[in-house]
Amino acid sequence: MKRAASLLAFLVLLVVAFYRDASSQSNLVREIAPGVFVRLAEPDKKIIANAGWVVFRDYVLAIDANYPWGARLILADIRRTTSKPIRFVFDTHYHADHAFGNSLFVDSGAAVVCTEDCMEESRRKNTPAWKGDKGEAEFDLKQWRLEHPQLGFTNRMVFDDGAHRVELIPMGPAHTRGDAIAYLPKERIAFTGDLCGTRAGNNMADPDADPENWVRSLDRLSRFDIATLVPGHGPIGGHNAIAPQRLLFSTMIDGIRAGIARGESADHIAQSLDLTGIHPNGEDVARTQASIKAVYAKLRK
Protein backbone atom coordinates (compact mmCIF):
# COMPACT_ATOMS: atom_id res chain seq x y z
CA MET A 1 0.00 0.00 0.00
CA LYS A 2 2.83 2.38 0.92
CA ARG A 3 4.59 1.52 -2.35
CA ALA A 4 1.40 2.29 -4.33
CA ALA A 5 0.96 5.59 -2.49
CA SER A 6 4.58 6.54 -3.17
CA LEU A 7 4.19 5.69 -6.85
CA LEU A 8 1.00 7.76 -7.05
CA ALA A 9 2.73 10.73 -5.39
CA PHE A 10 5.63 10.46 -7.84
CA LEU A 11 3.25 10.40 -10.82
CA VAL A 12 1.41 13.45 -9.50
CA LEU A 13 4.71 15.34 -9.17
CA LEU A 14 5.67 14.27 -12.68
CA VAL A 15 2.39 15.56 -14.12
CA VAL A 16 2.72 18.85 -12.20
CA ALA A 17 6.28 19.27 -13.48
CA PHE A 18 5.14 18.59 -17.03
CA TYR A 19 2.39 21.18 -16.91
CA ARG A 20 4.67 23.70 -15.21
CA ASP A 21 7.16 23.24 -18.05
CA ALA A 22 4.40 23.51 -20.66
CA SER A 23 3.10 26.68 -19.02
CA SER A 24 6.60 28.16 -19.00
CA GLN A 25 6.98 27.22 -22.64
CA SER A 26 3.78 28.99 -23.66
CA ASN A 27 4.97 32.12 -21.89
CA LEU A 28 8.27 32.14 -23.79
CA VAL A 29 6.90 31.64 -27.30
CA ARG A 30 4.61 34.34 -28.64
CA GLU A 31 2.82 34.41 -31.99
CA ILE A 32 2.94 38.16 -32.67
CA ALA A 33 1.23 37.85 -36.07
CA PRO A 34 -0.11 34.84 -37.99
CA GLY A 35 2.91 32.64 -38.67
CA VAL A 36 5.37 35.03 -36.98
CA PHE A 37 6.84 33.89 -33.67
CA VAL A 38 9.13 35.23 -30.96
CA ARG A 39 11.01 33.06 -28.49
CA LEU A 40 11.92 35.22 -25.52
CA ALA A 41 15.23 34.96 -23.71
CA GLU A 42 15.79 32.87 -20.58
CA PRO A 43 18.73 34.52 -18.81
CA ASP A 44 18.72 31.95 -15.99
CA LYS A 45 19.53 29.30 -18.63
CA LYS A 46 22.15 31.53 -20.30
CA ILE A 47 19.80 32.08 -23.23
CA ILE A 48 20.20 35.84 -23.10
CA ALA A 49 18.91 36.90 -26.53
CA ASN A 50 15.47 36.81 -28.09
CA ALA A 51 14.93 34.79 -31.27
CA GLY A 52 12.15 34.43 -33.80
CA TRP A 53 10.89 32.66 -36.89
CA VAL A 54 8.52 33.18 -39.79
CA VAL A 55 6.52 30.28 -41.20
CA PHE A 56 6.25 30.66 -44.98
CA ARG A 57 4.06 28.41 -47.15
CA ASP A 58 6.83 25.88 -47.78
CA TYR A 59 9.60 26.62 -45.29
CA VAL A 60 10.70 28.44 -42.14
CA LEU A 61 13.06 31.41 -41.80
CA ALA A 62 14.56 31.60 -38.31
CA ILE A 63 15.97 34.82 -36.86
CA ASP A 64 19.09 34.60 -34.68
CA ALA A 65 20.60 31.23 -33.83
CA ASN A 66 21.44 32.04 -30.20
CA TYR A 67 23.97 29.97 -28.26
CA PRO A 68 24.01 26.22 -29.04
CA TRP A 69 22.06 25.34 -25.88
CA GLY A 70 19.54 28.02 -26.82
CA ALA A 71 19.36 26.85 -30.44
CA ARG A 72 18.47 23.37 -29.25
CA LEU A 73 15.42 24.70 -27.38
CA ILE A 74 14.48 27.14 -30.15
CA LEU A 75 14.49 24.34 -32.72
CA ALA A 76 12.20 22.31 -30.47
CA ASP A 77 9.90 25.32 -30.13
CA ILE A 78 9.79 25.76 -33.90
CA ARG A 79 8.79 22.11 -34.26
CA ARG A 80 5.91 22.71 -31.85
CA THR A 81 4.55 25.38 -34.19
CA THR A 82 5.15 23.81 -37.62
CA SER A 83 6.50 20.73 -39.37
CA LYS A 84 7.74 22.74 -42.37
CA PRO A 85 11.48 22.54 -43.10
CA ILE A 86 13.77 25.20 -41.65
CA ARG A 87 15.56 26.47 -44.75
CA PHE A 88 17.27 29.62 -43.46
CA VAL A 89 18.53 31.18 -40.24
CA PHE A 90 19.36 34.89 -40.27
CA ASP A 91 22.06 36.20 -37.93
CA THR A 92 21.36 39.86 -37.13
CA HIS A 93 25.08 40.14 -36.30
CA TYR A 94 28.01 37.87 -35.53
CA HIS A 95 28.07 37.94 -31.71
CA ALA A 96 28.07 34.64 -29.83
CA ASP A 97 24.63 34.97 -28.22
CA HIS A 98 23.11 35.41 -31.69
CA ALA A 99 25.24 33.16 -33.89
CA PHE A 100 27.10 30.42 -32.00
CA GLY A 101 24.09 28.11 -32.43
CA ASN A 102 24.38 28.20 -36.23
CA SER A 103 25.61 24.61 -36.53
CA LEU A 104 22.43 23.20 -35.00
CA PHE A 105 20.34 24.99 -37.61
CA VAL A 106 22.66 23.83 -40.40
CA ASP A 107 22.32 20.26 -39.16
CA SER A 108 18.55 20.76 -39.37
CA GLY A 109 18.83 21.72 -43.04
CA ALA A 110 19.13 25.51 -42.86
CA ALA A 111 21.55 27.87 -44.59
CA VAL A 112 22.97 30.71 -42.46
CA VAL A 113 22.35 34.21 -43.84
CA CYS A 114 23.76 37.58 -42.81
CA THR A 115 25.36 40.69 -44.29
CA GLU A 116 28.71 40.43 -46.06
CA ASP A 117 30.23 42.50 -43.26
CA CYS A 118 28.81 40.09 -40.68
CA MET A 119 30.31 37.15 -42.60
CA GLU A 120 33.73 38.81 -42.51
CA GLU A 121 33.44 39.61 -38.81
CA SER A 122 32.42 36.03 -38.05
CA ARG A 123 35.39 34.56 -39.90
CA ARG A 124 37.85 36.99 -38.33
CA LYS A 125 36.57 37.18 -34.75
CA ASN A 126 34.44 34.15 -33.92
CA THR A 127 37.11 31.50 -34.43
CA PRO A 128 39.39 32.87 -31.65
CA ALA A 129 36.35 33.64 -29.48
CA TRP A 130 35.14 30.05 -29.83
CA LYS A 131 38.55 28.56 -29.11
CA GLY A 132 39.03 30.79 -26.09
CA ASP A 133 35.69 29.91 -24.53
CA LYS A 134 35.85 28.78 -20.90
CA GLY A 135 32.33 27.39 -20.56
CA GLU A 136 31.71 24.31 -18.45
CA ALA A 137 29.27 21.40 -18.44
CA GLU A 138 26.30 22.11 -20.73
CA PHE A 139 27.80 25.50 -21.61
CA ASP A 140 31.07 24.05 -22.92
CA LEU A 141 31.31 24.88 -26.63
CA LYS A 142 33.51 21.86 -27.29
CA GLN A 143 30.30 19.81 -27.55
CA TRP A 144 29.41 21.67 -30.74
CA ARG A 145 31.17 23.19 -33.75
CA LEU A 146 31.50 26.72 -35.02
CA GLU A 147 29.57 27.35 -38.22
CA HIS A 148 30.13 30.59 -40.13
CA PRO A 149 27.37 32.14 -42.28
CA GLN A 150 27.14 30.80 -45.83
CA LEU A 151 25.00 33.37 -47.66
CA GLY A 152 25.78 37.08 -47.59
CA PHE A 153 24.17 40.26 -48.89
CA THR A 154 25.25 43.88 -49.20
CA ASN A 155 22.07 45.83 -49.98
CA ARG A 156 19.19 43.66 -48.82
CA MET A 157 17.82 40.15 -49.14
CA VAL A 158 14.09 39.54 -49.56
CA PHE A 159 11.99 36.45 -48.82
CA ASP A 160 8.49 36.72 -50.29
CA ASP A 161 5.99 33.96 -51.03
CA GLY A 162 2.91 36.15 -51.29
CA ALA A 163 1.78 35.32 -47.76
CA HIS A 164 4.82 36.77 -45.99
CA ARG A 165 7.49 39.23 -47.02
CA VAL A 166 10.66 39.52 -44.93
CA GLU A 167 13.29 42.09 -45.86
CA LEU A 168 16.78 41.66 -44.42
CA ILE A 169 18.25 45.16 -44.36
CA PRO A 170 21.82 46.20 -43.41
CA MET A 171 21.93 48.86 -40.68
CA GLY A 172 25.58 48.95 -39.65
CA PRO A 173 27.99 50.11 -38.59
CA ALA A 174 26.22 50.50 -35.26
CA HIS A 175 26.37 47.80 -32.58
CA THR A 176 28.65 45.96 -35.03
CA ARG A 177 29.75 46.69 -38.58
CA GLY A 178 27.53 43.92 -39.95
CA ASP A 179 24.26 44.78 -38.19
CA ALA A 180 21.02 44.07 -40.03
CA ILE A 181 17.33 43.85 -39.21
CA ALA A 182 14.50 41.60 -40.39
CA TYR A 183 11.56 43.78 -41.40
CA LEU A 184 8.05 42.54 -42.22
CA PRO A 185 6.30 45.47 -43.94
CA LYS A 186 2.86 43.84 -44.10
CA GLU A 187 2.79 43.07 -40.37
CA ARG A 188 4.87 46.18 -39.47
CA ILE A 189 7.26 44.05 -37.43
CA ALA A 190 11.00 44.62 -37.00
CA PHE A 191 13.44 42.13 -35.49
CA THR A 192 16.30 44.50 -34.66
CA GLY A 193 18.95 42.32 -33.05
CA ASP A 194 21.11 44.47 -30.78
CA LEU A 195 20.59 47.61 -32.83
CA CYS A 196 17.77 48.47 -30.43
CA GLY A 197 17.19 47.33 -26.85
CA THR A 198 14.17 47.71 -24.59
CA ARG A 199 15.70 47.19 -21.16
CA ALA A 200 18.01 48.96 -18.73
CA GLY A 201 21.56 48.97 -20.02
CA ASN A 202 23.17 49.27 -23.41
CA ASN A 203 26.01 47.82 -25.45
CA MET A 204 27.90 51.01 -26.24
CA ALA A 205 30.90 49.70 -24.28
CA ASP A 206 31.27 46.85 -26.76
CA PRO A 207 34.54 47.12 -28.74
CA ASP A 208 32.56 46.74 -31.99
CA ALA A 209 30.26 49.68 -31.27
CA ASP A 210 30.43 52.77 -33.49
CA PRO A 211 28.81 55.44 -31.27
CA GLU A 212 27.97 58.18 -33.75
CA ASN A 213 26.95 55.84 -36.56
CA TRP A 214 24.77 53.94 -34.10
CA VAL A 215 22.79 57.13 -33.48
CA ARG A 216 22.40 57.59 -37.24
CA SER A 217 21.25 53.98 -37.59
CA LEU A 218 18.60 54.52 -34.92
CA ASP A 219 17.44 57.61 -36.81
CA ARG A 220 17.13 55.45 -39.91
CA LEU A 221 15.27 52.74 -37.96
CA SER A 222 12.83 55.36 -36.67
CA ARG A 223 11.72 56.03 -40.26
CA PHE A 224 10.41 52.48 -40.65
CA ASP A 225 6.68 51.86 -40.16
CA ILE A 226 6.91 49.67 -37.05
CA ALA A 227 4.06 48.52 -34.82
CA THR A 228 5.97 45.68 -33.12
CA LEU A 229 9.68 45.83 -32.35
CA VAL A 230 11.46 42.66 -31.26
CA PRO A 231 14.81 43.63 -29.73
CA GLY A 232 17.82 41.42 -29.27
CA HIS A 233 17.44 41.89 -25.52
CA GLY A 234 14.45 42.99 -23.49
CA PRO A 235 10.67 42.74 -23.81
CA ILE A 236 8.78 43.12 -27.07
CA GLY A 237 8.09 46.79 -27.74
CA GLY A 238 6.88 49.16 -30.40
CA HIS A 239 8.19 52.07 -32.42
CA ASN A 240 8.40 54.12 -29.22
CA ALA A 241 11.26 51.87 -28.01
CA ILE A 242 13.66 53.57 -30.42
CA ALA A 243 13.59 57.11 -29.00
CA PRO A 244 14.88 56.35 -25.47
CA GLN A 245 17.93 54.51 -26.75
CA ARG A 246 18.62 57.23 -29.30
CA LEU A 247 18.30 59.86 -26.56
CA LEU A 248 20.62 57.93 -24.26
CA PHE A 249 23.32 57.61 -26.90
CA SER A 250 23.12 61.17 -28.22
CA THR A 251 23.07 62.66 -24.69
CA MET A 252 26.00 60.46 -23.72
CA ILE A 253 28.06 61.48 -26.76
CA ASP A 254 27.27 65.19 -26.30
CA GLY A 255 28.13 65.02 -22.60
CA ILE A 256 31.42 63.26 -23.25
CA ARG A 257 32.39 65.75 -25.96
CA ALA A 258 31.64 68.63 -23.60
CA GLY A 259 33.69 66.98 -20.86
CA ILE A 260 36.63 66.41 -23.19
CA ALA A 261 36.49 70.09 -24.19
CA ARG A 262 36.71 71.00 -20.49
CA GLY A 263 39.71 68.71 -20.05
CA GLU A 264 37.86 66.21 -17.84
CA SER A 265 38.90 62.58 -17.44
CA ALA A 266 36.80 59.59 -18.45
CA ASP A 267 36.32 58.66 -14.79
CA HIS A 268 35.12 62.15 -13.91
CA ILE A 269 32.60 62.22 -16.76
CA ALA A 270 31.38 58.71 -15.92
CA GLN A 271 30.68 59.79 -12.34
CA SER A 272 29.13 63.16 -13.16
CA LEU A 273 27.06 62.47 -16.28
CA ASP A 274 23.70 61.28 -14.93
CA LEU A 275 21.60 59.44 -17.52
CA THR A 276 19.35 57.52 -15.12
CA GLY A 277 16.34 59.63 -16.07
CA ILE A 278 16.24 58.07 -19.53
CA HIS A 279 13.85 55.13 -19.09
CA PRO A 280 14.58 52.27 -19.37
CA ASN A 281 17.92 52.31 -21.17
CA GLY A 282 19.77 54.67 -18.82
CA GLU A 283 18.80 53.01 -15.56
CA ASP A 284 21.74 50.58 -15.34
CA VAL A 285 24.35 52.89 -13.84
CA ALA A 286 27.26 50.45 -13.99
CA ARG A 287 26.76 49.69 -17.68
CA THR A 288 26.25 53.34 -18.52
CA GLN A 289 29.48 54.29 -16.78
CA ALA A 290 31.35 51.54 -18.64
CA SER A 291 29.88 52.85 -21.89
CA ILE A 292 30.90 56.42 -21.10
CA LYS A 293 34.51 55.33 -20.57
CA ALA A 294 34.52 53.30 -23.79
CA VAL A 295 32.99 56.10 -25.86
CA TYR A 296 35.42 58.59 -24.29
CA ALA A 297 38.34 56.49 -25.54
CA LYS A 298 36.86 56.29 -29.04
CA LEU A 299 36.14 60.02 -29.26
CA ARG A 300 39.66 60.86 -28.09
CA LYS A 301 41.25 58.95 -30.99
Where do the PLM segments sit?
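Active-site metal-binding motif and surrounding structural segment of the metallo-beta-lactamase
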Residues: 56-61, 69-113
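Metallo-beta-lactamase
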Residues: 26, 30-31, 59-60, 67-69, 120-255, ...
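Accessory terminal helices/loops
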Residues: 223-225, 236-301
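Bacterial N-terminal signal peptides
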Residues: 8-17
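Divalent metal-coordination and catalytic microenvironments
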Residues: 35, 54, 64, 78, ...
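Positively charged n-region of N-terminal signal peptides that target proteins for export
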Residues: 1-4
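Conserved beta-strand hairpin/beta-sheet module of binuclear metal-dependent hydrolase folds
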Residues: 30-77, 182-194
